[in-house]
Every structure is written in C-alpha cells, then in structure tokens.
C-alpha cells in the first residue's frame, strides 16, 4: 500500500460519475439509518446495536468492542467534577512513523499504534474533502419531500490562537491553551479554553486510504488573565468549518474544516480536516457509571467512522 492517501482520479468518464453519485447516495442513506433511537436515548441493550453491524466482518465488530473497553478504562478514571468537560472526537488522515515519516505498515486487520511510534497527519486530499462537502451539502440543501430534514449544516469562521505553558511536567506537556475568535461576529467575546489530553488512540486501518485518531480530552473554560495567555501564541489556525448534525438521531456531529495554520516565525500551510465528535449526551452514561449504554454510543461513533472511510474509497464503492 502507498505511503500516501489515495486521491480519486480526475479522469472519470460519465458512466463512472453516475455510478459514483449512486454510491454517494447509498452512503448518505446509511448515515441516515445510523442512529441509536428516535430520541437519542440509549438502547436498553448493546445487543441491538451490535446487530446493526452484522454486515461488517466479525473482526471489525470485535475491534469496536476492544476500543470501547479501552476508552471506558480511561473515562472511568476521570474525576466526577471534570465529566462535564470531557470531549471525544475522531480525526482522519494518515498515521506516519515518527522515525521514517512514512505511513505505518498495515496489518491484516485494524490495530492501535502506540503513540510513541506514530502520529496522525490530520489532512485529507482536497478532492476527497470536496467530495464529502458535495455529498453532505446535497442532503442539507435538498431534503426529501417525503421525509423530515436529515442533515443540518452550520458554517463558522474562526481563528484559534494556541498557547503552551512553560511547564516541563508530564501534565504540562499534555496541556495546551486556546483563545478562539469568531471572525464573522466581532460582537461575540473571545473564548478561552484549557485542553488536557487524557488519551489518544491511533488506529491504522488496512486496505483504506484513511486512518484515524480517537482523542479523549478535557476542555475547561479559562479566563483571559490565566498565566498561559500572557505569553505569545505558538501558532494560529484560521478555520472555515461546516458542521453537520443528523436530526438528533445520531449522538454525534461531523466537521469538515479548511484550516490555514501559521506557526510563529514560520510559513503558512493549508490543510483539510475531517472529524467526528460525540454529542454531550454520552457524558450522562459516565456520570451514571453505565458502561453498557456508553458502549452503545461509542459503537455508533465507530460505525460512523467506518462509513466515512467507505465514502472515501470511491473506487471500492463503484465495484459494489
């Protein structure tokens, strides 16, 4: 497999383009059907959710269960007073070896890469990014007349300034500070956040042009007077983000973001990011120590990841 993500070819004939549109519609349909319940309340049993993945391989289902177990292990250790600040998100891109900077060699099934060995380059090819935009925009702007609106889109333009603390401790290295500014509404106040990484899971997927990173973090509101914001920022990220939600039927939302990053005393570069974030309702399961219901939300989250990666594999979809 190539060390770089595969970008769909521009030399498609008209017949293939028709097939691609049908394949995209199929994925959109699966996104509509991927939900826990009509009210976002958890199922009474994880068994029903696992049945929805019966078309997946047994190995994929077992891997999802394994990820659920690992995630719960770290979430269960978070202090109750911090549960309201938990964020779980998944970014897509390519996992590269920290030593060689080449894409990690795949196994014959999904596996978790140790953080000390790899890192996720959270940038997808621009053409793939545009395909995602087109797919989701069509569902947002042209909902079915016979069905309720399935996808809702919100567009935001922001600038994040990222700060670092002069703290060499382990906790200090896992912490960053962010000041966010709304570029379209100057009347809104700046927001200040301290972000503490709890755990990252780097997932290398075989036979896929996209890998993923699941991040569990704490995002804690801060004040402008916090010591970290007295230093100069280490980088700025100007973002044009489209956020898609799914009628409260899926306990997650999808972000497509074009990012221009400027590092201090360095050059600018542009990236295209695709990420999924769990909606806050999952925090209720942690407060209640309800592992079974959390697994339902987490499996829905992982199933969405599978659909996103499938949508990226246009060549594979055209043959099905």
From Swiss-Prot:
Its cofactor is Mg(2+); Mn(2+). InterPro entries: Cet1/Ctl1 (IPR040343), CYTH-like_dom_sf (IPR033469), mRNA_triPase_Cet1 (IPR004206), mRNA_triPase_Cet1_sf (IPR037009). It holds the Pfam family mRNA_triPase. Keywords: Cytoplasm, Hydrolase, mRNA processing, Nucleus. Magnesium and/or manganese. Specific for polynucleotide RNA in the presence of magnesium, but becomes specific for nucleotide triphosphates in the presence of manganese. This is Polynucleotide 5'-triphosphatase CTL1. GO terms for molecular function: mRNA 5'-triphosphate monophosphatase activity; polynucleotide 5'-phosphatase activity. Residues 1-23 are annotated as: Disordered. It is found in: Cytoplasm; Nucleus. It is an enzyme of class 3 (hydrolase). Probably involved in an RNA processing event other than mRNA capping. Releases gamma-phosphate from the 5'-end of RNA to produce a diphosphate terminus. Belongs to the fungal TPase family. It comes from Saccharomyces cerevisiae (strain ATCC 204508 / S288c) (Baker's yeast). Residues 1-12 have a biased composition (Polar residues). Residues 13-23 have a biased composition (Basic and acidic residues). The gene is CTL1. One of its GO terms (biological process) is 7-methylguanosine mRNA capping. Its EC number is 3.6.1.74. Its main location: cytoplasm. CDD domains: CYTH-like_mRNA_RTPase. It catalyses: a 5'-end triphospho-ribonucleoside in mRNA + H2O = a 5'-end diphospho-ribonucleoside in mRNA + phosphate + H(+). Coiled coil: none annotated. One of its GO terms (cellular component) is nucleus.
